[in-house]
């Protein structure tokens, strides 16, 4: 009985560690999407499937200034 409880406890601890580290890795990959997209002209960015996707037009401010 002690062996099965110890095995179960080790299994639960390892599964919690794996789940925690996988979440941390996902946030690190997409942590700076808005900064990366803003570096080439301010656009919004979203993390999709672990990759940073930039949306919007970078020349929108120039067109607005020309319009006025």
UniProtKB/Swiss-Prot annotation:
The keyword Disulfide bond applies. PROSITE patterns: SCORP_SHORT_TOXIN. InterPro entries: Scorpion_toxin-like_sf (IPR036574). Residues 1-26 form the signal peptide. It is found in: Secreted. GO terms for molecular function: potassium channel regulator activity; toxin activity. It comes from the Eukaryota. The modification Tyrosine amide is found at residue 55. Negative results: does not block voltage-gated potassium channel rKv1.1/KCNA1, rKv1.5/KCNA5, and rKv1.6/KCNA6. Potassium channel blocker. At 3 uM, this toxin blocks voltage-gated potassium channels rKv1.2/KCNA2 (5%), hKv1.3/KCNA3 (10%),rKv1.4/KCNA4 (20%), Kv11/hERG (24%), and Shaker-IR (27%). The presence of a 'disulfide through disulfide knot' structurally defines this protein as a knottin. Is completely devoid of the classical secondary structure elements (alpha-helix and/or beta-strand). This is Potassium channel toxin epsilon-KTx 1.2. It comes from Tityus serrulatus.
